[in-house]
């Protein structure tokens, strides 16, 4: 089972004016609120008993060794070795039909150390973190084979796609414990470009 706590930070700038003074910073601290983020899951079979995958998401307290403040939590049992778990939020107030450059940071917590071995892959290095943006609502839909798939190009497993890029994994430095540790994953040096919706 792969579990993580996540904190998301976004840096947004117009591609036609990339000076720091023209940029907009959107920052979300989940200690006081979930800020309207919605969780979802994809890349698993549509079966009669969804509890088989033990899909869970919530806004809850972090482990005590991380201070106990609230955070977004998501987990699932990866029977398919391909389970995709995500948080999404609609951003408004951007210029409509405009190409923008995003640099996204995600702060998360993981208890899985580097170098561990698990069934279907390492619980740290083989759990990939991605970030992206699209001008429509991301959601999982059932394909003709009866599997939940995303309505965007996120890539598969360790590869990014047209709408999402890989920013790291959930492996923490090996400290000899199962305690959660804070990790920072970001797109610095690899900005992501997307065109905003007609409504901005």
Model-predicted regions and their roles:
Residues 6-16:
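Bacterial N-terminal signal peptides
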Residues 21-52:
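Extracellular carbohydrate-recognition regions
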Residues 58-86:
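Surface-exposed, low-complexity/disordered Ser/Thr/Gly/Pro/Asn-rich loops and linkers
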Residues 79-95, 187-189:
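Short beta-strands within extracellular/lumenal beta-sheet-rich domains
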Residues 99-113:
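A short beta-strand element within beta-rich, extracytoplasmic domains
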Residues 119-141:
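Short edge-strand/loop segments of extracellular domains
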Residues 140-194:
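Exoplasmic/lumenal beta-rich domain surfaces
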Residues 194-200:
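Noncatalytic modules at the cell exterior or secretory-pathway interfaces
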